Amino acid sequence: MGKGLLGKRVAIGGSRKTEEISTIIEKQGGIPVIRPLQGTVYLAEKQVEPDLRTFAEEKADWVIFTTGIGLETLVDMAEKIGLKDEFLQAIRQAKAACRGYKTLSALKKLGITPEASDEDGTTRGLIRSLEPHDFSGKTVMVQLHGEKAPALMAFLEEKGASVLPILPYQHIPPEEETVERLCRELMNDEVDAVCFTTAIQVRSLFDFAKGRGYINEVKKVFEERAIAAAVGKVTAEALREEGITRLLAPEIERMGAMIVELAKYYEEKE
């Protein structure tokens, strides 16, 4: 194996498989710096129940699902509060749209064929498929997963929709101390690259930087010095939504492939 990351300090934003990813970085000559940005995603049954009741009773013109597990969880939650039939009826009466093949599969299991779905697993792809439809004055229920999907929400609101977001899984941000430390390391040129393995990690870093007033400095670092690496399309899309265009993402959506891509970038740069 080459040494494309020789002497490079590579921050890891994930909290799973950190030993495995650290080993790959070290084999490439790099120095892994573990800075967990994931936080905790938890099942928010109590918080979601009022929204679920509203949707089951008042219905919607459109329903948009962004994850398969989110759809399945909402069905389970509706069953627990005695509204499964009403919930399924509300979905079946509405026009449906979805992001990702797992979500499409979960809808088909319920006998629902969506009117719109992405071609590439991204929110941008989902928005493209929704473009031809009229949302003016329409009520749209959107199932989200731990984060707010700002581009999708802005698109629907611009189209004149009334949006009811439902988050069966909600997010507790990571430890402030960890994110503060990474922001400082970026601004002080102490980190050469940051590896993001989920969109939530991207939001955690940039939301924190916005809150602390570091956002312009952090963006400048990614534009000029440190490189952002994304494990796949959805994570890369979250970076672009934050205004980061100088980034790497492997064709094969694997952590190992992301590190190899990063090493290749530095080898070619040298």
From Swiss-Prot:
<dbReference type="InterPro" id="IPR003754">
    <property type="entry name" value="4pyrrol_synth_uPrphyn_synth"/>
</dbReference>
<dbReference type="InterPro" id="IPR036108">
    <property type="entry name" value="4pyrrol_syn_uPrphyn_synt_sf"/>
</dbReference>
<protein>
    <recommendedName>
        <fullName>Uncharacterized protein YjjA</fullName>
    </recommendedName>
</protein>
<dbReference type="GO" id="GO:0006780">
    <property type="term" value="P:uroporphyrinogen III biosynthetic process"/>
</dbReference>
<dbReference type="InterPro" id="IPR039793">
    <property type="entry name" value="UROS/Hem4"/>
</dbReference>
<dbReference type="GO" id="GO:0004852">
    <property type="term" value="F:uroporphyrinogen-III synthase activity"/>
</dbReference>
<dbReference type="Pfam" id="PF02602">
    <property type="entry name" value="HEM4"/>
</dbReference>
